[in-house]
């Protein structure tokens, strides 16, 4: 399953008869989100998915075109989402301490700037109802021009989908 773009990645972890986690070259392991990203990636890999943890890359770099090529020509061109799960980009958003409930809305906004699929850090435990309310407010806001396809919540080492846009 190795193809040309995998020269930018090294295998980090293989789950027997399941998925793999790859790290992009140049990934900053001292990044505060690194351990969360690895935990999230392992969660999806255990479900049989191939997950690539991505590093920020300048859009003029040839590696950007190899890895983030599908974003060219979209509103997400020049953006660098954090994860590539089975060929689909996801953005992980955490918050700066201390946690305040209004930061959930900010995480959704920042995540939607990077990808239409977002994973937010909810280790402080905002309620599902509150998070869903924030999504509805964002979507119904006329000045918010981003599309949110899916939103996952990362809590205490586990990941669960909280929102998926209904197909019309």
Positions of PLM-derived features:
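Metal-dependent nuclease catalytic core centered on acidic motifs
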Residues: 1-68, 74-77, 95-168
């Amino acid at each position: 399953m190795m193809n040309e773009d995998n020269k930018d990645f090294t295998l980090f972890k293989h789950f027997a008869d399941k998925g793999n986690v790859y790290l992009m070259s140049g990934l900053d392991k001292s990044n505060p989100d690194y351990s969360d990203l690895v935990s999230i990636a392992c969660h999806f890999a255990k479900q049989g998915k191939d997950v690539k943890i991505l590093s920020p890359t300048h859009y003029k770099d040839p590696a950007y075109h190899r890895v983030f090529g599908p974003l060219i020509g979209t509103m997400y061109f020049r953006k660098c989402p954090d994860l590539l799960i089975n060929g689909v980009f996801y953005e992980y958003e955490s918050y700066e301490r201390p946690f305040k409930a209004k930061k959930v809305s900010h995480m959704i906004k920042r995540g939607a700037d990077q990808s239409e699929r977002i994973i937010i850090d909810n280790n402080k435990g905002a309620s599902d109802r509150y998070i869903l309310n924030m999504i509805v407010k964002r979507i119904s806001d006329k000045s918010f021009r981003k599309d949110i396809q899916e939103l996952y919540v990362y809590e205490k080492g586990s990941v669960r989908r909280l929102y998926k846009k209904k197909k019309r």
